[in-house]
């Protein structure tokens, strides 16, 4: 069965552009779940212009308070990203090859070119019992 995971990054961008906690990401995620989402996705970028790494434990706590709701963290596997994901222990991590200055994710991994790098990164997440998904180019 197909499941819906809602990416709440644009709400984080709006919050950050206002310089306040409005909209509150925890409230947004709670409403998504209330209206039928089976997962919440966040993509913290190195510059934290959307989701912030400090959002991860807050959303994780919310997701863990619901049965059958998953948490997916997506992003480029930098050292900080890997560490934050392993500490948060989401259900899934989606690896995206976007450079730190990219406005949005516009292409996927070239698995042949990045084979060894991806194997090493995937192994780290799998050893921490985190399911891995890759954003790939056809």
Cite the ranges covered by each PLM segment.
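Glycine-rich, aromatic-flanked loop segments that form ligand/cofactor-binding clefts
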Residues: 81, 86, 93
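Short Gly/charged-rich anion-binding patches and loops
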Residues: 27, 80, 120, 138
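A short acidic, helix-capping loop that chelates divalent metal ions and anchors anionic groups
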Residues: 12-17, 101-107
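A short alpha-helix capping/helix-coil boundary motif
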Residues: 7-10, 37-38, 98-102, 120-125
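Conserved N-terminal beta1-alpha1 strand-loop-helix module at the mouth
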Residues: 1-71, 76, 86-89
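Surface-exposed amphipathic alpha-helices with a cationic face
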Residues: 57-64, 119-129
């Amino acid at each position: 069965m197909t499941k819906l995971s809602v990416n709440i990054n644009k709400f984080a961008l709006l919050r950050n552009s206002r310089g306040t906690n409005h909209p509150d990401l925890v409230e947004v995620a709670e409403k998504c779940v209330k209206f039928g989402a089976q997962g919440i996705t966040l993509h913290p970028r190195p510059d934290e212009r959307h989701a912030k790494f400090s959002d991860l434990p807050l959303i994780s706590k919310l997701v863990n308070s619901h049965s059958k709701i998953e948490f997916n963290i997506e992003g480029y596997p930098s050292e900080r990203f890997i560490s934050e994901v392993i500490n948060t222990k989401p259900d899934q991590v989606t690896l995206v090859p976007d450079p730190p200055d990219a406005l949005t994710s516009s292409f996927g991994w070239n698995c042949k070119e990045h084979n060894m790098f991806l194997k090493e990164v995937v192994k780290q997440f799998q050893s921490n019992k985190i399911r891995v998904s890759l954003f790939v180019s056809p």
